[in-house]
């Protein structure tokens, strides 16, 4: 593999440790819980869910962390203020590691950061996210909270190029008059996690992968993405699976999506990724072995370059 000349930031947060040079620390893996239509959710607006099933999923991911050495993160999604607050209160009771505060609603994200601060578990939380769409109200809410970690999205809708992604981090690019990294610093963020914002294939997916190298080479920050979304937005794959189902090949239709879904995480890992948002937490037993194997290959090749894998690295645990 390779080593970056730039000194690389290591994220040491809420018991998780990732980042650094390729092959140094294993990739952190974040599974999403309470996502849209998640079968364990009984009322998505109020945040009512099967607590036993939720705890089992979180524990299974934690077990995979113990087995492979890859740090586990829990991405908590809630569509409303009430739901997200209920969810994160529960997760904080059963999980001591990092959790992402995630919602399509800015109000819900703000409520979650406020609740985490008041309840004393903000040091576990990763805000998702600081991006060009953040408004003054949400920024001030984040700044007033005790949250110290955040996903920072390097996406400029006016310039999806690699240069555009770097510019939006440094100076706001063509969309904002301030860089996302400056915003993060002003909000009190000590642990910025750079999401390279993978778009569908044919619309810039390759730029995001290349941006992973660029961000680490130029800024030395931890990078990653939710690259598993690429197969879901792939029209050809959707039609191919439809054809398989019409031929009565239901299981293969399911399997081919799983292969592409989990395989996408390998792409991000090979592209010097430090963390991967791998999708449904239900897939922990698929995602962790695949990424751990990739990490092992990277670490083995990086040894000749002077990179020593951490004691908890899969290369030291799974052979």
UniProtKB/Swiss-Prot annotation:
Single GO molecular function: tetrahydromethanopterin S-methyltransferase activity
Pfam families: MtrH
Coiled-coil annotated residue ranges, if any: none
The keyword Translocase belongs to this UniProt entry's keyword annotation: yes
Biological pathway: One-carbon metabolism; methanogenesis from CO(2); methyl-coenzyme M from 5,10-methylene-5,6,7,8-tetrahydromethanopterin: step 2/2
First-level EC class: translocase
Alphabetically ordered keywords of this record: Methanogenesis, Methyltransferase, One-carbon metabolism, Transferase, Translocase
Reactions performed catalytically: 5-methyl-5,6,7,8-tetrahydromethanopterin + coenzyme M + 2 Na(+)(in) = 5,6,7,8-tetrahydromethanopterin + methyl-coenzyme M + 2 Na(+)(out)
Matches recorded under InterPro entries: Dihydropteroate_synth-like_sf (IPR011005), MeTrfase_MtrH/MtxH (IPR023467), MtrH (IPR028342)
UniProt record, GO biological process: methanogenesis, from carbon dioxide; methylation; one-carbon metabolic process
Highest taxon, organism lineage: Archaea
Enzyme Commission identifier(s): 7.2.1.4
UniProt function note: Part of a complex that catalyzes the formation of methyl-coenzyme M and tetrahydromethanopterin from coenzyme M and methyl-tetrahydromethanopterin. This is an energy-conserving, sodium-ion translocating step. MtrH catalyzes the transfer of the methyl group from methyl-tetrahydromethanopterin to the corrinoid prosthetic group of MtrA.
Family: Belongs to the MtrH family.
Subunit structure: The complex is composed of 8 subunits; MtrA, MtrB, MtrC, MtrD, MtrE, MtrF, MtrG and MtrH.
Descriptive protein name: Tetrahydromethanopterin S-methyltransferase subunit H
Naturally occurring in which organism (per UniProt): Methanococcus vannielii (strain ATCC 35089 / DSM 1224 / JCM 13029 / OCM 148 / SB)
